[in-house]
């Protein structure tokens, strides 16, 4: 079966790397995720990654506790680089040539983010892991994912969620009558105020015609199923469902 998408960006939360611990980095968990990503990559799909840093640091609570917000956000960016390096190492162990590019230069451990270089890596079948957000405070890793996806001309952003199998009209953990959407448009997401991504990220995705697929990453094989076009999770696009 031919993949639905040829070039994707996978957005992982930092907590996804923590496993059952909830904080820190659990290497077996990272290896499990890397194995699945490597299998999809080996099917011929070009892949980039953005990983959050919430397993190591959260800037907003630190700022609320009195820390300077800019410094708190920069600290969080460094956390995303740690996650990127660990994931890149695991991907390399599965035989996938991988590069880490950071928005804040730190050439001893990673390449600086250069769009043209990132595109060349993808064209040469390397996975690129983007770290340090966009290099500026006040911007989330969701916005980073949308911006980088637009820059590398990705067809879709795969929002891999922990235990969440899509987008609902209410919190399914609190409302037994919550209804899951199979398809939505970017406009509907913004109008309904659905908190899939922040508003900036949603707008970038809409303006650049990038599909957004929200799915449960805890089920093995789901990344491959999304890439092959199976109906799992929720797909957000500019096309209204028929």
Swiss-Prot record:
Its annotated function is as follows:
Catalyzes the reversible phosphorylation of UMP to UDP.
Tell whether Cytoplasm is among the UniProt keywords.
Answer: yes
Q: Which organism is it from?
A: Streptococcus agalactiae serotype III (strain NEM316)
Please identify the protein, giving its name as recorded: Uridylate kinase
Under which pathway is this protein filed? Pyrimidine metabolism; CTP biosynthesis via de novo pathway; UDP from UMP (UMPK route): step 1/1
In its UniProt record, which GO terms are filed under biological process?
Answer: 'de novo' CTP biosynthetic process; UDP biosynthetic process
* Annotated residues for binding of UMP: 53, 73, 134-141
| UniProt gene name | pyrH
Molecular function GO terms recorded: ATP binding; UMP kinase activity
Q: Where is this protein localized, as stated in its record?
A: Cytoplasm
Q: How does it assemble?
A: Homohexamer.
Positions of region (Involved in allosteric activation by GTP)? 19-24
Q: Does the keyword Kinase apply?
A: yes
Q: Where does ATP bind?
A: 11-14, 54, 58, 162, 168, 171
**Which HAMAP family has this protein been placed in?**
PyrH_B (MF_01220_B)
List the catalysed reactions: UMP + ATP = UDP + ADP
Q: EC number(s)?
A: 2.7.4.22
Regarding activators and inhibitors, the annotation says:
Allosterically activated by GTP. Inhibited by UTP.
**Family label:** Belongs to the UMP kinase family.
Q: Which UniProt keywords apply?
A: Allosteric enzyme, ATP-binding, Cytoplasm, Kinase, Nucleotide-binding, Pyrimidine biosynthesis, Transferase
EC class name: transferase
């Amino acid at each position: 079966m031919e993949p639905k998408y040829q070039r994707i960006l996978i957005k992982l939360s930092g907590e996804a790397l923590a496993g059952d611990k909830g904080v820190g980095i659990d290497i077996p968990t990272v290896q499990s995720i890397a194995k699945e990503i490597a299998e999809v990559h080996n099917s011929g799909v070009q892949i980039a990654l953005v990983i959050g840093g919430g397993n190591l640091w959260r800037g907003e609570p630190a700022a609320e506790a009195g820390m300077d917000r800019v410094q708190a956000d920069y600290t969080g960016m460094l956390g995303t680089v740690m996650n990127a390096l660990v994931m890149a190492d695991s991907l390399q162990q599965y035989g996938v040539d991988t590069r880490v590019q950071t928005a804040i230069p730190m050439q001893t451990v990673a390449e600086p983010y250069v769009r043209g270089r990132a595109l060349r890596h993808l064209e040469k079948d390397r996975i690129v892991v983007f770290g340090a957000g966009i290099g500026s405070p006040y911007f989330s890793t969701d916005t980073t994912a949308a911006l980088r996806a637009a820059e590398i001309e990705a067809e879709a952003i795969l929002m891999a969620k922990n235990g969440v199998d899509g987008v609902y009209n209410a919190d399914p953990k609190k409302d037994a009558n919550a209804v899951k959407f199979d398809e939505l448009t970017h406009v509907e997401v913004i109008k309904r105020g659905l908190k899939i991504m922040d508003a900036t990220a949603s707008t970038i995705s809409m303006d650049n015609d990038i599909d957004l697929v929200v799915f449960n990453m805890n089920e093995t094989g789901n990344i491959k199923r999304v890439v092959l076009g199976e109906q799992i999770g929720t797909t957000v696009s500019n096309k209204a469902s028929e």
